[in-house]
A protein has these predicted regions:
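Conserved core of the sugar-phosphate nucleotidyltransferase
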Residues: 131-179
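Short acidic donor-binding/metal-coordinating loop in glycosyltransferase active sites
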Residues: 126
C-alpha cells in the first residue's frame, strides 16, 4: 500500500480510537476530543470526514476505532450522511496505537473489502484541526502525483519541542516536497 492521495480514486482511513485523556474534563474516555465541537459546528471527527470527502468518495472512507467509541463514530457520521455504511467502521479489539491500527485497517480493506493491495490510501487522524483546508487538499493532491512508490507524510514547522510528538528531518528541497 502507498499512503498518498488521488482525487476520487484513493481510499481514506481515519484514525479515531484515542482515549481523550489529555483534554480532560472536556474530553474523557467515553467521549474523546475527536467527538467535541471545538472550532465550529462540527466535531473534529466530522471535520475530518468532510475534509476526506474533498479527495475521496464516501464509499472509500473508512474509520478505525475501539468498541467503546463505535456508536460515537457512527452517530456523528449519521448526522452528516444518513446513508453512511457502518461496515466502513473498523473496530479494534484493543487500543492498538497508530501503526498496529493502520495495519489492522489495511488488512481489513484487502481481505474483507477486497481492495487491491496496490491502491493508494491516505491515513488521517480524526482529532486534528486544519486551518487552511483548501491548501491541505491541494497539498495531498499534489503529493499523490509525486509520491511514486514512496510513503509520504505531512508535517508542520514546530514552535517548540514536545515529547509527545515525532519529528521529521527534512532532506533536499524538491519544490514543496523534501527527500
Amino acid at each position: 500500500f502507498l499512503f498518498s492521495c488521488f482525487f476520487y480514486s484513493m481510499y481514506s482511513l481515519i484514525l479515531c480510537g484515542g482515549s481523550g485523556t489529555r483534554l480532560w474534563p472536556l474530553s474523557r474516555k467515553n467521549f474523546p476530543k475527536q467527538f467535541l465541537n471545538l472550532f465550529n459546528n462540527h466535531s473534529l471527527l466530522q471535520g475530518t470526514f468532510l475534509r476526506a470527502q474533498k479527495t475521496t468518495p464516501t464509499e472509500k472512507i473508512f474509520f478505525i476505532t475501539n468498541k467503546d467509541n463505535f456508536f460515537n463514530v457512527y452517530n456523528q457520521l449519521q448526522e452528516l450522511d444518513k446513508d453512511f455504511d457502518k461496515k466502513q467502521i473498523i473496530i479494534e479489539s484493543t487500543n492498538l496505537n497508530t501503526a498496529p491500527a493502520v495495519t489492522l485497517a489495511v488488512k481489513y480493506l484487502v481481505e474483507t473489502i477486497k481492495v487491491d493491495p496496490e491502491e493508494i490510501v491516505t491515513v488521517l487522524p480524526a482529532d486534528h484541526y486544519i486551518e487552511d483546508e483548501e491548501k491541505y487538499k491541494n497539498l495531498l493532491l499534489e503529493a499523490e502525483k509525486n509520491i511514486g512508490d514512496n510513503i509520504g507524510t505531512v508535517g508542520i514547522t514546530v514552535l517548540k519541542p514536545h515529547t509527545g510528538f515525532g519529528y521529521i528531518k527534512k532532506g533536499e528541497n524538491q519544490n514543496i516536497f523534501y527527500n
